[in-house]
Structure formats: structure tokens, C-alpha cells
UniProtKB/Swiss-Prot annotation:
The keyword Endoplasmic reticulum does not apply. This is Multifunctional CCA protein. It comes from Leptothrix cholodnii (strain ATCC 51168 / LMG 8142 / SP-6) (Leptothrix discophora (strain SP-6)). GO terms for biological process: RNA repair; tRNA 3'-terminal CCA addition. The lineage of its organism: Bacteria, Pseudomonadati, Pseudomonadota, Betaproteobacteria, Burkholderiales. Its cofactor is Mg(2+); Ni(2+). Coiled coil: none annotated. One of its GO terms (molecular function) is phosphatase activity. Its EC number is 2.7.7.72, 3.1.3.-, 3.1.4.-. It catalyses: a tRNA precursor + 2 CTP + ATP = a tRNA with a 3' CCA end + 3 diphosphate; a tRNA with a 3' CCA end + 2 CTP + ATP = a tRNA with a 3' CCACCA end + 3 diphosphate. Residues 226-327 form the HD domain.
Length: 419
């Protein structure tokens, strides 16, 4: 029985990156021998065991055979007769098909170390085409490694898989799992570039695919192309280290620009509402978590108002907070501001630009939330107000709190006073 370190841990060690979870393959053993040695069986589809002390995963070497379309259409074979080369041959990419033995010797039958040196993502063999999830994994690794290219033969194979309808059989949960992980990588734009290059983006996210080639006003967007802008926004979000809900909101904020009537281009009047309308079925189709979708919907509807809020007076600011439910959910509003700032910076030449809207909105919300709401309501009741009039009194008190805070003044008003 031989135990060897395999997969991502070997890859990351060779790259000099931090090694996360370590996966092991066991050659020359049976499930009964593993249990007898104290390993805890946990695998559902094939024999996987937890080490009795480290609790790391140890999987018996296996082969797999395609029996039906999609992600689940496989039959696995494990046994003491399955060799290490057999097991490595079923893996997706050469850089993930390496192993280290007990002595620290690298076993690399598919040239993974060479491809690491050349920064190339290359499939191991024809078995890659048997699992459509591997297209998503390939794209995710492109996002993680950033400057790695995809081998031409691998890209061609992915195109054939897409044309054969393999990605159409993917279950939504699996698509979201890989998409969400890719959004959290260092360069999310690379994931979408790879998916687009092989034709998978149009099948999986047609709402995003149609943004490429759609022009925007060059005075606002020097990069012009809406798809290019979206990629810049996603990479800005990654650079700023924001959370998954914020990154998904960035992904969905401009979907409506893909359906702008041609005769009004490059303007995009009303794209906010169209973005929200397209976002809802996309989130439902992918089974996106509620926290991600709700923030994305808010950002889609309100990002233009946030961008333009520098010209809002106190009353307009309070109305914005009303629409965003910022009184009850200030934390979500903060996430929306983060997404809007990524949007503003995700433009050619604006990557390091100041975004004064965010601090002003934070200050205005703090001022409005700082009033004693109970005292305002009690005073209103003492004046004989009730029903909707109580709500209006609270609304006016919030406006007054914002208007009286010097830090919340509009830049134009400050300039007049200073002049």
C-alpha cells in the first residue's frame, strides 16, 4: 500500500503558493485494508477515507468510465490493481495530475511541471471531454492563476464539448459552485474570457455574453465595450477583496445594457430596470443564494442613483435610503456602496479615481439614523398626528438631520459657501 500526495497540493507547492487542503491517493489497497488500518470511510460514490489522526482525505486509486451525458454519468472502478498512472490519467489538467511519494519524489507522467513553467493550462487526455464540469474548472483555474494561457488543443476540445451540448446537461448547483469560486479568484475576468472563447458563456450566461460588443458613451466609459467594462469591474472587485455578494452584484449590475434598443446607443436609458428584470431569472436558474441575489438586485436598480448622488440634496438622499431599505439593513447598503465603487473604478483611466459619493452617503446615512426616532414619534403624537402622518414626521426629521450636517452638503453647495 502506497500513499501519495496528489492534485492541487502538489501544484501549489511547486508554484510556491500556500498549500490548503491536502489530498492523498492510495495505491495497492482495498477498502477492507483501509478500515483495518483505522481509516474512516466517508465516500459516497467511491472509496474515500479520513486519516485516523490528521483527518485528511485518502482516496483509493480509481479509474472512471463515461456512461451517460452530464456530470453524473460515470462508473468508477477501484481496486488494488489500479495503478498511480491510471489514477492520474483520469484527472483534468496536467498541472493537477502530479504526485509526490513518501520520499518527496515528483511523479509527473503528463508533463505538469513543464506546463507550470510555461504557464499553460492543458488537458491530460481525451477523458477530459467526458465531464463538462471540467470546462468550468479550466476557466476557474485561469482566473486563479491569472497569467496562464489555455493550450490551443484544450480550447478546441472545449469548443467541441460545447457544440455537442455537454454543458447543457450541467445541474445549476454545480454551475453556481464553480462560478462563485471563480468570482472569488484573483482575476475573475479570465474565467469569463475562457468560457467565452470556447462558446460556453453563451450557453451558461447568455445575459453576460450579449454585453460584449455593446457600445457605451466614451466620455463616461473610455473602454467603450460594455463587456470589457464588466470584466474591469470584476477584476477591480477582486483587487479590493470584496465579498461574494458584492462580486455577484458587480456581475449583474449592467445586464440591461445588453438589451438596449439599437437606435438609442451608446446611451442606455432605463438599463437599471432591465438589468434587474434579467437578473431575476438568471439568479433563479443558477439557484443563487438569496443574499447574493438581493444585493445584486438592489445594485442593478440603484447604482446610477448612487453614482449621481453627489448632486442629491438631503431629501433625495433620504429617498434613496428609503428605496434601499437602509434603515433596517445598513450593512447591505454598505455592500451596495462597495459594488458601486468597483463599478466606478472599473473604467479605463479611472482605476485609481476617488469616489466621493461613498463617504458622503455613509455620513448622510449615519446622520439620518442618528436621530431619536422614538422621541420624534412621541412629539408627533403629542401634536395630534397619527397614521401616515407619523411616517412623514420621521421622514422630515431624517431630512433635517442630513441637511444640518456640514459633511453631508453637496459639493456645489460647499463651493458656494466657500466662494
Amino acid at each position: 500500500m502506497r500513499c501519495l500526495l496528489v492534485g492541487g497540493a502538489v501544484r501549489d507547492q511547486l508554484l510556491g503558493r500556500p498549500v490548503g487542503d491536502r489530498d492523498w491517493v492510495v495505491v495497492g489497497a482495498t477498502p477492507e485494508q483501509m478500515v483495518a488500518a483505522g481509516y474512516l470511510p466517508v465516500g459516497r460514490d467511491f472509496p474515500v477515507f479520513l486519516h485516523p489522526r490528521t483527518h485528511e482525505e485518502y482516496a483509493l486509486a480509481r479509474t472512471e468510465r463515461k456512461t451517460a451525458p452530464g456530470y453524473h454519468g460515470f462508473v468508477f472502478h477501484t481496486g488494488a490493481d489500479v495503478s498511480l498512472d491510471d489514477d492520474l490519467a483520469r484527472r483534468d489538467l496536467t498541472i493537477n495530475a502530479m504526485a509526490l511519494d513518501e520520499a518527496g519524489t515528483l511523479i509527473d507522467p503528463w508533463g505538469g511541471r513543464r506546463d507550470l513553467a510555461h504557464k499553460c493550462l492543458r488537458h491530460v487526455g481525451a477523458a477530459f471531454a467526458e465531464d463538462p464540469v471540467r470546462i468550468l474548472r479550466l476557466a476557474r483555474f485561469a482566473a486563479r492563476l491569472g497569467d496562464f494561457s489555455v493550450a490551443p488543443e484544450t480550447l478546441a476540445l472545449c469548443r467541441r464539448m460545447v457544440e455537442a451540448g455537454e454543458v447543457d446537461a450541467l445541474v445549476p448547483e454545480r454551475v453556481w459552485q464553480e462560478l462563485s469560486r471563480g468570482l472569488m479568484e484573483a482575476r475573475p475576468s479570465r474565467m469569463f474570457e475562457v468560457l467565452r472563447d470556447c462558446g460556453a458563456l453563451a450557453r451558461l450566461l447568455p445575459e453576460v455574453e450579449r454585453l460584449f460588443g455593446v457600445p457605451q458613451r466614451a466620455d463616461y466609459h473610455p473602454e467603450v465595450d460594455t463587456g470589457v467594462h464588466l470584466m474591469m469591474v470584476l477584476d477591480t472587485a477582486a483587487q479590493r477583496g470584496v465579498s461574494l455578494p458584492v462580486r455577484y452584484a458587480c456581475l449583474g449590475h449592467d445586464l440591461g445594457k445588453g438589451t438596449t434598443p439599437a437606435h438609442i446607443l451608446p446611451r442606455h436609458i432605463g438599463h437599471e430596470g432591465r438589468s434587474a428584470a434579467l437578473l431575476a431569472p438568471m439568479s433563479a436558474r443558477l439557484k443563487v443564494p438569496a443574499a447574493c441575489h438581493e444585493l445584486a438586485d438592489l445594485v442593478a436598480r440603484e447604482h446610477s442613483n448612487v453614482h449621481g448622488s453627489g448632486n442629491f440634496d438631503a431629501a433625495a438622499l433620504v429617498r434613496l435610503f428609503d428605496r434601499c431599505d437602509a434603515w433596517r439593513r445598513p450593512e447591505r447598503f454598505e455592500l451596495a456602496l462597495q459594488a458601486c465603487e468597483c463599478d466606478a473604478r472599473g473604467r479605463l483611466g479611472f482605476e485609481q479615481a476617488h469616489y466621493p459619493q461613498a463617504p458622503r452617503l455613509r455620513q448622510a446615512l449615519a446622520a439620518a439614523r442618528g436621530i431619536d426616532a422614538a422621541a420624534v414619534m412621541a412629539s408627533a403624537r403629542a401634536r395630534g398626528l397619527n397614521g401616515p402622518a407619523l411616517g412623514r414626521a420621521l421622514h422630515e426629521a431624517r431630512i433635517e438631520a442630513v441637511a444640518s450636517d456640514p459633511a453631508c452638503q453637496r459639493p456645489a453647495d460647499q463651493a458656494q459657501q466657500n466662494g
